Design a protein with these regions (language model features):
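Short, low-complexity disordered leader/linker segments with a strong preference
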Residues: 1-13
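Short, glycine-/small- and polar/acidic-enriched structural segments
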Residues: 10-154, 158-161, 177-178
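Pocket-lining segment of extracytoplasmic ligand-binding domains
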Residues: 166-178
Length: 178
């Protein structure tokens, strides 16, 4: 009687994974670097995208079958493509914030909206200002909720849509107010 061949001896099953250049993707990359995918009879094909919405745009072309993405793309994916959330890697809700520079006038007004006594800013300190954001991201959602709490909409401010890395670079270069 011969032993059954191991999974590694067979041709590995190609598994297309979507990822973004952030810490959640490290586990896929590290597993591939260590050969752990091959040990389990898999061949990870990691496809990197700048945003979760970019990942979703690649879904109809079947460029990936599993991966990690953000909250807003998960919801959009479920609505548009019947995708499933199978697990939450970590809760990043506490890091989603509206960011300003130390000299921003919004920092001088606290509690303008009594429903949010710790919220900084007022319609007068925010209206007409420039917001850097990534379309359909948790950042975009948080910014919209911030404006709503101040009785404003996206039409009351200047919206500059950019990829996440561009948002950081632009803000660091002094572009934008929020």
């Amino acid at each position: 009687c011969l032993p059954a061949p191991s999974a590694a001896a067979e041709k590995p099953f190609k598994l297309d994974i979507c990822a973004m250049p952030e810490h959640e993707s490290f586990i896929f990359w590290y597993a591939k670097e260590q050969g752990w995918d091959k040990d389990e009879g898999l061949d990870f094909q990691i496809h990197f995208f700048q945003t979760g919405m970019d990942q979703l745009e690649a879904l109809p072309a079947k460029q990936w079958v599993v991966g990690g993405t953000g909250t807003v793309p998960i919801l959009v994916g479920a609505l548009r493509y019947n995708t499933y959330l199978i697990g939450i890697a970590n809760d990043e809700s506490w890091v989603n914030a509206v960011t300003v520079r130390p000299d921003n006038p919004a920092l001088k007004v606290k509690g303008w909206n009594p429903e949010y006594p710790n919220l900084l800013g007022s319609p007068e300190t925010v209206k007409g200002k420039t917001f850097l954001y990534t379309q359909s991201s948790s950042q975009h959602f948080g910014m919209s909720e911030y404006l709503k709490a101040l009785g404003l909409t996206e039409k009351d401010v200047v919206m500059q849509n950019m990829d996440p890395a561009q948002v950081l670079a632009a803000f660091d270069a002094g572009i934008g107010d929020f």
